[in-house]
Design a protein with these regions (language model features):
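S-adenosylmethionine/decaboxylated-SAM
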Residues: 2-231
């Protein structure tokens, strides 16, 4: 479909904007700002970053994606280029698998957005390779933290009594039902990989937001001595 900002077939991003303003607003307009996006698709998130955060003339974003025709979504690369044409000078495209492209990139980045392979291994691998590229103080956002394969459908709605009891103890039945779905197919969802990565980075990050997406701020880096001698 064509909307008021470009040619898009899907809109999987706009509902994230309020949280992105909260998580990334302090970066807006900074000179020398650098962002890395793993999974760019039609360019909605790329466009939003260019228009709202990467507004300085020297701000740049590296976009990693296969950028190849897809049997379901067609030539989304052409739509990406059309939708982001006004910001072409800020964008560098890296066409290929993330595990090939990320090893060629040099940090540091202020912002990293991970929206690649929707599996535990894929999310873990992208996070492991991108984390060293993130600045201390930078923000990494994982998309689809609570994603489940579409074949599972919507979570089953519990009884009214069960919902009331969940609410009384401060829970959210929808989230809890979704988490049970995720547990049933954990290796096929990003959450297991993201949780595994962050477990290894305890003391090096703080979670700044967790819902369908999860965002963390890097609070410490690995010093050279630690990397070289902890063997």
């Amino acid at each position: 479909m064509t909307d008021d900002v470009g040619d898009f077939q899907e809109n999987w991003f706009e509902h994230n904007v309020p949280r992105w303003r909260e998580w990334l607003g302090s970066f807006s307009g900074r000179t020398g700002l650098r962002a890395l996006e793993i999974g760019s698709f039609e360019g909605r998130s790329t466009l939003w970053l260019c228009e709202n955060i990467l507004t300085a003339d020297d701000a740049r974003i590296d976009c990693v994606d296969f950028f190849a025709p897809d049997p379901v979504y067609g030539d989304y690369h052409a739509r990406f280029r059309q939708n982001t044409a006004a910001h072409r000078a800020k964008i560098r495209e890296h066409a290929g698998a993330s595990f090939d492209m990320l090893r060629k990139l040099e940090g540091p980045y202020d912002i990293v957005y991970v929206d690649g392979w929707h599996s535990a291994f894929g999310a873990l691998a992208d996070g492991v390779m991108a984390w060293p590229l993130l600045k201390v103080g930078g923000v990494m956002i994982f998309d689809d933290y609570l994603w489940v394969p579409p074949k599972l459908g919507e979570p089953e709605k519990p009884s009214g009594l069960s919902r009331r009891l969940t609410k009384l103890r401060g829970g959210d039945w929808r989230r809890e039902a979704r988490l049970r779905q995720i547990d049933s197919v954990a290796v096929d969802t990003p959450k297991l990989g993201v949780d595994g990565l962050l477990a290894t980075l305890r003391g090096y990050h703080e979670v700044i937001g967790s819902d369908y997406q999860l965002a963390v701020r890097k609070t410490r880096g690995f010093d050279q001595g630690q990397v070289g001698h902890d063997t």
